[in-house]
Amino acid sequence: MSTTAHEAVYASVAKPWLKYYDASYIGQPLPDCTTFEYLYQQNKQHLNEPALEYFGRKITYADLFVNIKKTAAAFRAIGLKKGDIATVVSVMTPEIIYAFYAADLIGATLNLVDPRYSVEGIHDYITEVDSHLLICLSVTYDRCVQAAKRTHVERILVVSPADSLSLPMAIGYKLKNPDKNHYFSNVIRWKDFIAAGQGQSTAADPVDPMDHACVVVHTGGTTGSPKGVMLTDRNFNAIAKQFKTYEFLCHRGQTLMNIMPPFIAYGFACGVHLPLTLGLKVTIIPNADAAKLGSLVLKYKPQLMFGVPTHYQQLATDIRLKKKDLSFIRMYAAGGDAISVGAEKNVNEFLAAHNVEFPMAKGYGMTEVSSAATAAAGPITKPGSAGIPLVDTIVSVFEPGTTKELPIGEQGEICICSESIMKGYYHKPEETAAVKQVHPDGRTWVHTGDVGYIDEDGFVFVGS
């Protein structure tokens, strides 16, 4: 697809995708506050509504805020302070969500690490950010203790998958999974940790939301060595605020089933902060087995879900769903990986045959932009595309290795301009400068390294 010089139209100027957005959403200022403050502002009038669900136990927004404040007080009691980085090695549990907002409240940062990593890998990530506090799941304790050797870790906070279960379920879990860990004197269990916070201040420690990194998440290293990506409060709030344009699909009172892990930007920004700031209930599935996804969908009937393409391909072939009415589904979104046109067609045919109004939603982004930069949701979609840029995001293509923008329709390197662009790579200024560049137009762009083009309607197509 090509455009002659005299007809050249540039995406960064024309922004053809804006025709799909209601004018009331365009150009609205971003919340100038922390992630915790934004969460509270959005829900302070709805405290009795459910915020989280964990194996049948429901946690209201009132309880969520109480637990966040208790966690913040406990962090202060064990010495975590403004500017510190605590490393977390865990799947998603309510405690990890409390820890995220509590760390943000006191001006600290969470370094989120995949619990499947080796001892050496976990050790390297602890050392990289010089953590003095390590938070880990009880089932990863042995490896984490080994990983913490020869680091500056002073305390280890252990979270059990049973900590937020109802009493009968907690008893059943402990009978089936007896804790055989040998805990050293520097280890504190979650309930003892919370008790230690009694009497400590729960006041917020002021930070600059444009500068304070609420998390460090790690790239996979597929295009070089793994890097710690610092994402700020403003980055997370930018993702959440931009998805308010999809309120016709996702709104207060609905359920989002969270099947993504906390150690990727997609899992926390889209799977936790976004739905909670929209007033949804987040049903937490800590270890989502794709083979069991169909039964989970039938059990919880979530209107929304963020996953990867294989999740939906699995659903489309699940015999348990063969004759089921799935009309409760509003937006099941696939990101994190590409999906072929044929596979997309199969999933959409399955959804339509089961009374789902809209096709599978899609998105494109990367860790460096806090997960998402584009979305195809509801009726706004084209086969094979990654959707249109989010309402406050600009996506265009450039001559590879340069800042020369190419016209709409021409293929080049995809670059992204958004308030969700990372603060930078942790202690890697040269790598940051190579990816995060100020162009002649004065805007800051992330160079993705991906090849693609934008069509005349503003839809982004990734790949040749």
What would you call each of these model-derived segments?
Residues T60-A62, C214-K241, A376:
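Conserved AMP-binding A3 loop
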Residues I78, L105-A195:
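Structural core segment of the AMP-binding/adenylate-forming
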Residues K404, C415-S464:
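Conserved ATP-binding/catalytic segment of the ANL
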Residues Q303-G307, A316-P383, I394:
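Gly/Ser/Thr-rich phosphate-binding loop
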Residues N237-T255, F263-F306, Q314, D318-I319:
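Conserved AMP-binding/adenylation subdomain of ANL enzymes
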Residues K180-H218, S225, F248-T255:
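Conserved pre-ATP/AMP-binding loop-to-beta segment of ANL
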Residues F65-K70, M210, V229-L249, I259, ...:
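Conserved structural elements of the adenylate-forming
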Residues N48-T93, I97-Y101, S118-H123, T127, ...:
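Conserved AMP-binding/adenylate-forming core of the ANL superfamily
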